[in-house]
Regions:
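Metallocofactor- and cofactor-centric catalytic cores in central/energy metabolism, strongly enriched
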Residues: 1-170
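Active-site pocket-lining/capping segments in soluble small-molecule metabolic enzymes
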Residues: 158-188
């Protein structure tokens, strides 16, 4: 049984040293994602001129969302937004793995982000253009979902503390701090 009150405390320097390789590898992955996006845009002749055609998928099943997203891209969609399942903004954790049961939307998980990004990259290569992926990280796990999005090359991540304050009764201080931190991640 784990008793966190009896765990050995480590010096801040030792903690930072232990995390150094992990953080550098993670930052390198995010930089590589940004470069991959730039490479796709260059390969396909630059960015689109004019407004983007933005579509929403929200079946609750990531695999059905992929089917709809690919069809939308073939019909001209420039941005695919995957709507989160009802109530995910109130979860104080991020579910793990691919999900197939959501209500009014699909769970925002790192695996779901990865699955959709791959599908959009594949259809983008077929169509000769870059398809952007959008999701949402408002609510209790803003920084965590923003970090997952950066790791899986989401192009747009909407986050708004007021959503949680007005519609989910989330503590104002917490959600504003979360918004600040998640926007630092998104801005990187």
């Amino acid at each position: 049984e784990l008793d966190i009150t009896k765990m050995q405390w480590h010096d801040d320097f030792d903690i930072k040293l232990a995390l150094k390789d992990i953080t550098h590898a993670t930052v390198d992955r995010i930089k590589a994602n940004r470069q991959a996006r730039e490479n796709y845009l260059e390969q396909f002749g630059g960015d689109k001129k004019g407004p983007y055609l933005y579509v929403i998928v929200a079946t609750g099943n990531i695999y059905e969302d992929v089917t709809q997203a690919v069809a939308a891209a073939r019909q001209g969609a420039d941005v695919v937004a995957v709507i989160r399942t009802t109530g995910q903004s109130l979860l104080d954790f991020v579910p793990y793995g691919a999900t197939t049961e959501g209500f009014g939307g699909t769970m925002a998980t790192q695996e779901n982000f990865r699955i959709m990004r791959k599908a959009l990259d594949d259809v983008g290569v077929e169509l000769g253009r870059y398809i952007r992926l959008c999701n949402y990280c408002s609510g209790l796990c803003m920084p965590e979902i923003a970090a997952m999005g950066a790791l899986e090359r989401l192009d747009m991540m909407l986050n708004d503390a007021l959503y949680g304050i007005l519609f989910r009764d989330i503590n104002m201080k917490r959600t504003l701090v979360d918004q600040f931190f998640s926007r630092i991640i998104n801005g990187y």
